[in-house]
Amino acid sequence: MRYADPSANRDLLGNRTLLFIFICAFALVTLLQQILYSKSYIKRGFQFGWQRGDQQANWTGLFNDSDSPTEQNITGSSSRYFEFYKEPLEFNSTRCLELRQEILEVKVLSMVKQSELFERWKSLQICKWAMDTAEASLFKSTLSRCCNAPSFLFTTQKNTPVETNLRYEVESSGLYHIDQEIFKMFPKEMPYYRSQFKKCAVVGNGGILKNSGCGKEINSADFVFRCNLPPISGIYTTDVGEKTDVVTVNPSIIIDRFHKLEKWRRPFFSVLQRYENASVLLPAFYNVRNTLVSFRVKYMLDDFQSRQPVYFFHPQYLSSVSRYWLSLGVRARRISTGLILVTAALELCEEVHLFGFWAFPMNPSGFFITHHYYDNVKPKPGFHAMPSEIFTFLRMHSRGILRVHTGTCNCC
């Protein structure tokens, strides 16, 4: 005879009970981690964009350590938890100094997750950027000693006399002999001098510019640098502006899209006309491959009786700039044209603003963006160190040396 076990259908600390206990424990641990480690809840919290005209709110837990006069707490019991800002905080306010330090304490990009860097950067946007004159002057003095853009940014008759054997930047064993014909292509001396322009805009081509509405602010700058013949007319003008004082041309564009200017030249001439009287800047002495095609741009504009000046980077300047940024941790086979222009702008301008510089697939709010504002073509991997360059710019922004624009603009 078989006897039934009266406890057979009971779940006394059985599988279901253990599973329930495990789920509860996991949830509790997760909650504790959020409370203890997530700065989103205690330190920086949720914030709303100034561009939409909303108030800024910081979840501050049970403390308020800010002494800025622009901050006002909500009345009532909730004032212990929320802190609202009706306008941006001063860059040197106590709260902003803390937020700036949170960027600066990250020495290398690999120290934090990308999402954490974005969060710190978003938090800093409640602060109204202001140039730190002492920091900027110190940084510019180091550039003056190492690179000296006012003397060596372009190849000139003054810094490269006739009969000079000019050494290429990359192919260090190669020399280019400067004869009388080539010498005549160079300007007599640098057309710009130190701190000549009050406010400069260096415009990159990043997808972060799309739908930014920054065109008017870019156009309001005293001097505007652009990289590699980007589109600026039609649907793009609202976001990127159209004012251009210097535009660089990568010779690979001429080689791939315009057949080295060996046949038809008018299509390329038409492209340059979109930049009106902007100076055209080429790396003719980067390597042997670039030289002849760069010279052809000068010949072409002369043939069409264009007034657009054509300048060539001085290879000594390019080498010096590369060594300088390498010493600051930017390691790449070649630094980007954008970084070269930013370096030059810091010497030629009192105040430097960057637009379109972003090297991540998402914007600071976590939304996917295209690589460029006009297409989504990715660069060859391993050639530039764009994330490292952008990270360096964010640190320079935090130090008050230059300003990086990554949001929408409300200028003018």
Swiss-Prot record:
* Listed EC numbers: 2.4.99.-
Give expression by tissue. Highly expressed in brain. Expressed at low levels in other tissues, including liver, testis, lung, placenta and spleen.
Sorted UniProt keywords: Disulfide bond, Glycoprotein, Glycosyltransferase, Golgi apparatus, Lipid metabolism, Membrane, Signal-anchor, Transferase, Transmembrane, Transmembrane helix
Its annotated pathway? Answer: Protein modification; protein glycosylation
- Annotated catalysed reactions: a ganglioside GT1b (d18:1(4E)) + CMP-N-acetyl-beta-neuraminate = a ganglioside GQ1b (d18:1(4E)) + CMP + H(+); a ganglioside GD3 (d18:1(4E)) + CMP-N-acetyl-beta-neuraminate = a ganglioside GT3 (d18:1(4E)) + CMP + H(+); a ganglioside GD1a (d18:1(4E)) + CMP-N-acetyl-beta-neuraminate = a ganglioside GT1a (d18:1(4E)) + CMP + H(+); a ganglioside GM1b (d18:1(4E)) + CMP-N-acetyl-beta-neuraminate = a ganglioside GD1c (d18:1(4E)) + CMP + H(+)
Which Pfam families does the entry mention?
Glyco_transf_29
Cytoplasmic compartment segments? 1-16
What positions does UniProt annotate as the active site of this protein?
384
| Intrachain disulfide bonds | 200-349, 214-409
What are the GO BP annotations of this UniProt entry?
Answer: glycosphingolipid biosynthetic process; protein glycosylation
Q: Which residues form the signal peptide?
A: none
Spell out the subcellular localization from the entry: Golgi apparatus membrane
Q: What class of enzyme is it?
A: transferase
Q: Where are the transmembrane segments?
A: 17-37
At which residues is glycosylation annotated?
58, 64, 73, 92, 277
Molecular function via GO: alpha-N-acetylneuraminate alpha-2,8-sialyltransferase activity
The residues exposed to the Lumenal compartment are 38-412
Report how it sits in the membrane: Single-pass type II membrane protein
- InterPro entries given in the database record: Glyco_trans_29, Glycosyltr_29_Sialyltrsf, GT29-like_sf, Sialyl_trans
Q: Which Gene Ontology CC terms are recorded?
A: Golgi membrane
Q: Which domain of life is it from?
A: Eukaryota
Which amino acids does the record list as binding substrate? 228, 250-252, 336-338
What is the annotated role of this protein in its UniProt record?
Answer: Involved in the synthesis of gangliosides GD1c, GT1a, GQ1b, GP1c and GT3 from GD1a, GT1b, GM1b and GD3 respectively.
Query: To which protein family does this belong?
Result: Belongs to the glycosyltransferase 29 family.
Q: What is this protein called?
A: Alpha-2,8-sialyltransferase 8E
The uppermost taxa in this organism's lineage are: Eukaryota, Metazoa, Chordata, Craniata, Vertebrata
Query: What gene makes this protein?
Result: St8sia5
